[in-house]
Amino acid sequence: MKKIIIAIDGYSSTGKSSFARRIATEMEYIYIDTGALYRAITLQLAKTGILTSDNRIDRDAMKQELQRTEIHFQFNEAIQKSETFLNGDNVEEQIRSLQIANQVSYVAEIPEIRAYVDQILRDLGRERGVVMDGRDIGTAVFPDAELKIFMTSDLHIRAERRLKDLLPNQPDATLESVLSNLQERDRIDSSRETHPLMQAPDALLLDNSHLTMDQQMEWFQSILPNYLNDDCNH
Ligand code: DC
């Protein structure tokens, strides 16, 4: 069967990665969490002091650091999930902290960083058969993706979902801190100059505020056949 690229973009904490992962499993495609690359770079820049706690970045040092930075994903059979490795270390847990979430949008605004990540993503998608979730996959990284989905959902519902995910590892997280982080990230992601978050004209809109994962998958299965035939040029 023809292999395609499925691009899933949308606002923070709309459940893009759970949805994308489930699609990848069902289709036996590779799932790529593109936000993890921006988060890993943010961690590296913070660790080296190139990114300060008030989000200032030494651009020259950043360019040099990028040349020394190697990021890859490795599938962990035990938990059946792919994990992020930064210069050989498993950083999957560290990159999910609220600290990194608070800083990552400032790093993702920088054109050189976006070019670095785009190159990795285009290599990973060369053979197609991938599901990628992010902010600019359908608009900038793979504008020729056969199937594009843009996800949104109610801000409060997103914040509650995100808090539930964070609490086991960060018991001091509050609904207020999560809400303000989501609003701030949405604002920066949507207003940056390079590849801002927006719905591609040919993307399907999925508002999952009141949908379970099974309902989202039902919707997905209903639209998928339209994008798998050979003469599809959506
Ligand atoms: O999906 P996420 O929350 O892990 O993404 C983290 C940040 O990375 C998000 O605030 C914006 C940025 N990002 C981006 O600019 N472009 C992408 N394709 C993916 C993520």
What are these model-derived regions, one by one?
Residues I6-I8:
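Hydrophobic anchor at the beta1->P-loop junction of P-loop NTPases
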Residues F85-I95, A101, E160-N169, I188-H234:
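NTP-dependent small-molecule kinase module
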Residues T14:
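ATP-binding Walker
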Residues Y11:
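P-loop (Walker A) phosphate-binding loop of NTP-binding proteins
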Residues E65, F75-N76, L121-E127, R135-A140, ...:
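Small-molecule kinase domains that catalyze NTP-dependent phosphoryl transfer to phosphate-bearing small molecules
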Residues E26-I95:
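N-terminal phosphate/diphosphate-binding loop that engages ATP/GTP or pyrophosphate donors
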Residues E92-P168:
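ATP-dependent NMP and nucleoside kinases share a basic, alpha-helical "lid"
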